[in-house]
Amino acid sequence: MKLFELKPAPGAKKRPKRVGRGESSGHGKTSTRGHKGQWARSGGGVRPGFEGGQMPLTRRIPKRGFKNINKKVYTEVNVEKLERFENDTVITPELLLKEGVISKIEKDGVKVLGRGDLTKRLIVRVQKVSEGARKKIEAVGGKVEVI
C-alpha cells in the first residue's frame, strides 16, 4: 500500500445536500425549511436548554451542595511507591514529581499513606503523613519530617 492509494472507506464520504438550486431539484424555493416560522429564518432556533416557555429542567431541580474553599487537597502517595528509591534518599515532593511518582503537587502538598510494604531506609520530608505510613517508615529505620 502506498500513500497515493489511500482512500476513504465506502460510504464514509456523504455528499452534502444542495439546497436552493431550483424547483426541479426537490430542494428549491424554501430549501427544505418549510414556510415561515422560527426554524425557517437565518439564525433561527432556540437556545440550548429552552423548553418553549415551560420551566426548564435546570430551574425545576433544586440546588445542592457547595465547594468548600477551605478544603485541604493533598497529592496522595503510598509507601509502596517509595520502594523504588535507594537507602538514605531524602524524599521531597519535588523529587517525587521529577521521578514521575506523582503527576502534580496539589495546593496543600503531598501526603504519604500506608498501603504496601517498605524495606528501604528513607528520609521523608512531606506536608502530611498518615499514622500507618509513619510507623512503616520508622520501623525500617527511616525518618519522617513534616514540612
Curated annotation (Swiss-Prot):
Keyword list (alphabetical) reads:
Ribonucleoprotein, Ribosomal protein, RNA-binding, rRNA-binding
- Region Disordered, as annotated, extends over 1-58
| A Gene Ontology term for the protein's cellular component | cytosolic large ribosomal subunit
Q: Which Pfam families match?
A: Ribosomal_L27A (PF00828)
Q: Does Zinc count among this protein's keywords?
A: no
Look up keyword Cytoplasm and say if it applies: no
Please, which domain of life does this record's source organism belong to? Bacteria
Q: Tell me, what is one Gene Ontology molecular-function annotation carried by this entry? A: structural constituent of ribosome
Comp. bias intervals (Gly residues): 42-52
Entries under SUPFAM superfamilies matching the protein? Ribosomal proteins L15p and L18e (SSF52080)
Question: Its Gene Ontology biological processes?
Answer: translation
Which NCBIfam families does UniProt cross-reference here? rplO_bact
Give the quaternary structure.
Answer: Part of the 50S ribosomal subunit.
Instruction: Tell me the protein family, please.
Output: Belongs to the universal ribosomal protein uL15 family.
The record's function comment reads:
Binds to the 23S rRNA.
Q: What is this protein called?
A: Large ribosomal subunit protein uL15
Gene that this sequence comes from: rplO
